[in-house]
Amino acid sequence: CPMSLKSLLSRPIARISAARETKKAGEPHARQSRLLQDLLKRAQNTAFGRDHGLQSGMTLEQFQAAVPIRDYEGLKPWVDRAVKGEADVLWPGLPDYFCKTSGTTSGAKFIPITPDSMPNHTGSARNALLQYIHNSKNARFVDGKMIFLQGSPKLSNTDGGILMGRLSGIVAHHIPDYLQANRLPSFEANCKEPWEAKVNAIVEETKNEDLRLISGIPSWVQNYFERLLEVTGAANVKEVFPNFELFV
């Protein structure tokens, strides 16, 4: 079948993106040095920066001596201050969100998501898709439906009034407009609880769609596919979604 305008346009965009990322990969030391200086310049006036004597122009060795490697518990005193709504603690201003992790090692953890860090989450996903298009010369998946298996996009608030949720649920609010028309499942299905009810709702919404891409934690995707095959009676996923081609 003929490709859509979106599919055709994605190829030159993918070529430009791949060239840019290849250039970045070719100068890792210079780029990391510039990044360190940018981070130092912006963090030196935060509480963490002052507590550790961070200054623009510090060498890598000076930075390593000033900020020893530590686990989450070592950062927790500063994180707790930011969670309560104090500004300029770990990064200038207030975080937009706190990502609450499941805490498999030592209880729940709160990871600040700032306006400066959010583009890293959405940009890396975009670059991965563009790299696939560039390498495979295939952009047909953009013409079909895409499932994003995520945590609930419902957000709560910290004691300091900052939005909080699972990382994938937070990122769900920042999926670019050019993917929204093809995006599944619905907001309502994504918010269902418990997990089994959510999977059932997503299967019902998607089983008759032209799915071409799925993204999510492997165990979640496996759970979805297993339920899909139970409901449809199909022998494999390809029987249900003949045009399915990409798992991110």
Q: What is the predicted function of each stretch?
A:
Residues 3-31, 36-248:
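Active-site phosphate/ATP/adenylate-binding loop shared across adenylate-forming ligases
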